[in-house]
């Protein structure tokens, strides 16, 4: 059995393909979705999206929040923004993490602190996507 996965952002279609399984970050934690999953509508949190292809290869994407609808073996994810793990430059991601950590340490005031924490969270998620090791089959 398979799932039809669509990942859409206002700028582009990130994913439109049949898959075996996904692991999705929601506001209440990560959920795994296999064929014949119970229907669900859920908010999507910032975090990784793990995609298991029909050939059992795993890919990673990063979602920057949104909404997901799962029904009748179809998953539609409407995201504010997203990027495929393969599109993330590991060196650039590491540099962004270091900058975010430095900015957090020198943040002053509530607004700067909130912005620095958000930038750090985004940087860590991107690093996680780049460094993720898929489970062995």
Curated annotation (Swiss-Prot):
F-type ATPases have 2 components, CF(1) - the catalytic core - and CF(0) - the membrane proton channel. CF(1) has five subunits: alpha(3), beta(3), gamma(1), delta(1), epsilon(1). CF(0) has three main subunits: a, b and c. It is a peripheral membrane protein. Produces ATP from ADP in the presence of a proton gradient across the membrane. Gene3D superfamilies: 6.10.140.480, F0F1 ATP synthase delta/epsilon subunit, N-terminal (2.60.15.10). One of its GO terms (molecular function) is proton-transporting ATP synthase activity, rotational mechanism. Belongs to the ATPase epsilon chain family. Its main location: plastid. The lineage of its organism: Eukaryota, Viridiplantae, Streptophyta, Embryophyta, Tracheophyta. It is found in: Plastid, Chloroplast thylakoid membrane. One of its GO terms (cellular component) is proton-transporting ATP synthase complex. It comes from the Eukaryota. This is ATP synthase epsilon chain, chloroplastic. It comes from Agrostis stolonifera (Creeping bentgrass). Keywords: ATP synthesis, CF(1), Chloroplast, Hydrogen ion transport, Ion transport, Membrane, Plastid, Thylakoid, Transport.
């Amino acid at each position: 059995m398979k799932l039809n996965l669509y990942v859409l952002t206002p700028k582009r279609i990130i994913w439109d393909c049949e898959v075996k399984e996904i692991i999705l970050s929601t506001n209440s934690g990560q959920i795994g979705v296999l064929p014949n999953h119970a229907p669900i509508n859920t908010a999507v949190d910032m975090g990784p999206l793990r995609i298991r292809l029909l050939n059992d290869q795993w890919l990673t994407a990063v979602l920057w929040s949104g909404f997901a609808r799962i029904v009748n073996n179809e998953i539609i994810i409407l995201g504010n923004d997203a990027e495929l793990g393969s599109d993330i430059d590991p060196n650039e991601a590491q540099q962004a993490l270091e900058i975010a950590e430095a900015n957090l340490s020198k943040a002053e005031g509530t607004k700067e602190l909130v912005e620095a924490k958000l930038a750090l969270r985004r940087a860590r998620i991107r690093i996680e996507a780049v460094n993720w090791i898929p489970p062995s089959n």
